[in-house]
């Protein structure tokens, strides 16, 4: 187990045309793990098992039992119509059933509002009032002055949009195998095993370390065939989701209408200011935060042929949230190709598989993204705010990706897209992607195929196959999202797209199809990380 990250600096770089490669010896395997083994399991009532966790563990949010994630026990969705929300907390402890919990101060309430996700810990219950830990609760409410007035309608307790809520980590909810509860006083975990799990012989790992590897200013470096596993994310300020896995942290701070003051999730691998750094054939699995972050002036670097699976937050983050970085801090010329993203956002469901902020000449090509709670690929930032005009953004290419089963209705995260964009991006192209099942099963919650949101401008959308989308196959709703063009795409969708921006055009798109033509089938078959030809779901199948 690593308790501190392995750090590569400029001194660890390749020289004189050579590259330094870190990989397993032939026939070997290297796993970088941030977890410790939990032993001493003893039986308890109702088929549960209990163990004391090692002292190094802070708050365990995940266990891995023989390699399978175990999450905190959770309640059903809670009816909250009679709850009153204010600065002191939320009423309804009795009606929600929370007042009956034996250890309410270990319980978190999780709120889902449109594209935002919130996790705030209960501190105490007084009569019918539930109080929460700070700064999480204050940051979750409207009127913080830190997210801009237009975002208050997606704060906890909004009366404008519907929202959902459940409780997690209550022993009273531990009824489903594969889940557990943490008792902070006794420092024990109580687990309900799955069928066939023998807790006297099972390997149980709990995450401790937040980061495994940091590449800080290194160049000409290759990480090949490594496995990154079992990281934690302590998030001491709670979790107040802003967008795409970014959070609002701290008790105070500057106004962030353009999103330039939000906090990126902690990642197993962080590359800062890297040049020609390659991550190839690696696994990012069983993680409590994000998979990897490339930021702070990382250029000409690549993530390829790697797997991101069972990750609590987002899979991969490229770029930053400063619209006008210095030349040294600007991210440019990076490539994300032939990777597989499966089941990211396992805990923080507002996160995305691939996020790119302010970046230029980024290629996101031939990746497979599947089974995701919210958007698949998100590129751009800034909305329509004055400070986000003329940003470091453009020349990006999103091509040949296979994106299936995203914006899953059961997760109750809304207003996104399989491919989502923000901001003016001259020269950006979205082409030859296969999108199938994006918030499929409802037309009520703004689940799009390709979503050119807010000030998305100067983007070409061409040659894509978009099927089984809950709302629009392509959306450019804002009049200030200008000069976009959607041409030569195929879809079964019949909901009229909103291309409202000045100079935006739609032409030669095949809509309302009952059968994909051969050319569209070929595009869909060749999308993704392989093998090829990939499966293409025939139109007319409207099952789950």
Model-identified regions with their sequence ranges:
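Extracellular beta-strand solenoid repeats
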Residues: 7, 21-23, 31-33, 214, ...
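Extracellular beta-strand/beta-solenoid scaffold signature
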Residues: 3, 7-8, 43-50, 206-212, ...
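The right-handed parallel beta-helix/beta-solenoid scaffold, focusing on the short coil/turn
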Residues: 4, 18-20, 28, 61, ...
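Active-site proximal loops enriched in glycine and acidic residues that flank catalytic Cys/His/Asp
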Residues: 193, 273, 296, 320, ...
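Extracellular beta-rich repeat passengers
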Residues: 234, 444-532
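Right-handed parallel beta-helix
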Residues: 219-230, 275-289, 298-313, 326-345, ...
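An acidic- and aromatic-residue-enriched active-site/binding cleft used to recognize and process polar
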Residues: 11, 25-27, 37, 125-127, ...
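Extracellular polysaccharide-degrading/modifying enzymes targeting complex plant/algal/animal polysaccharides
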Residues: 1-273, 278, 324-325, 529, ...
């Amino acid at each position: 187990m690593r308790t501190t990250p392995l750090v590569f600096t400029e001194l660890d770089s390749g020289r004189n045309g050579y590259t330094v490669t870190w990989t397993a010896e032939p026939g070997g395997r290297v796993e970088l793990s941030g977890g410790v083994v939990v032993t001493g399991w003893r039986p308890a009532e109702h088929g549960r098992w209990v163990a004391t966790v090692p002292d190094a563990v802070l708050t365990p949010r995940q266990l891995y039992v023989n390699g399978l994630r175990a999450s905190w026990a959770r309640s059903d969705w809670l009816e909250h119509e009679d709850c009153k929300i204010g600065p002191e907390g939320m009423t309804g402890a009795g009606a929600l059933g929370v007042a009956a919990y034996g250890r309410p101060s270990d319980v978190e309430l999780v709120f889902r509002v449109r594209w935002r996700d919130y996790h705030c810990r209960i501190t105490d219950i007084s009569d019918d009032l539930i109080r929460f830990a700070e700064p999480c609760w204050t940051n979750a409410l409207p009127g913080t002055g830190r997210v801009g007035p237009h975002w208050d309608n997606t704060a906890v307790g909004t009366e404008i949009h519907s929202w959902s809520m459940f409780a997690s980590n209550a022993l009273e909810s531990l009824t489903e195998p594969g889940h557990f509860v943490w008792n902070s006083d006794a420092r024990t975990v109580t687990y309900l095993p799955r069928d066939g799990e023998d807790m006297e012989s099972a390997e149980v790992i709990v995450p401790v370390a937040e980061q495994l590897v940091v590449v800080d200013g290194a160049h000409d470096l290759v990480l090949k065939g490594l496995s990154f596993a079992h990281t934690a994310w302590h998030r001491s300020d709670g979790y107040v989701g802003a967008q795409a896995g970014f959070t609002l942290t701290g008790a105070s701070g500057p106004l962030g209408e353009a999103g330039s003051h939000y906090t990126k999730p902690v990642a197993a691998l962080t590359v800062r200011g890297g040049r020609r750094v390659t991550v190839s054939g690696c696994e990012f699995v069983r993680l409590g935060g994000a998979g990897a972050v490339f930021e702070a002036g990382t250029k000409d670097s690549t993530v390829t042929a790697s797997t991101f699976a069972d990750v609590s937050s987002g899979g991969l983050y490229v770029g930053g949230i400063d619209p006008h970085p210095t030349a040294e801090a600007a991210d440019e010329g990076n490539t994300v190709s032939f990777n597989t993203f499966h089941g990211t956002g396992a805990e923080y469901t507002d996160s995305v598989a691939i996020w790119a902020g302010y970046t230029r000449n980024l290629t996101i090509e031939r990746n497979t993204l599947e089974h995701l709670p919210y958007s698949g690929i998100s590129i751009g930032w800034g909305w329509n705010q004055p400070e986000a005009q003329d940003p470091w953004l453009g020349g990006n290419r999103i091509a040949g990706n296979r994106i299936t089963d995203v914006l899953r209705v059961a997760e109750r995260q809304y207003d996104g897209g399989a491919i989502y964009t923000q901001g003016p991006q001259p020269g950006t192209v979205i082409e030859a992607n296969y999108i199938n099942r994006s918030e499929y099963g409802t037309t009520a919650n703004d689940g799009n195929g390709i979503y050119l949101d807010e000030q998305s401008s100067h983007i070409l959308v061409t040659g894509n196959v978009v099927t089984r989308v809950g709302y629009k196959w392509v959306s450019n709703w804002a009049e200030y999202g200008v000069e976009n063009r959607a041409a030569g795409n195929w879809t079964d969708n019949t909901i009229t797209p909103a291309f409202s921006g000045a100079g935006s055009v739609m032409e030669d798109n095949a809509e309302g199809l009952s059968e994909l033509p051969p050319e569209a089938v070929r595009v869909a078959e060749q999308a993704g990380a392989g093998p090829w030809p990939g499966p293409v779901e025939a139109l007319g199948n409207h099952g789950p």
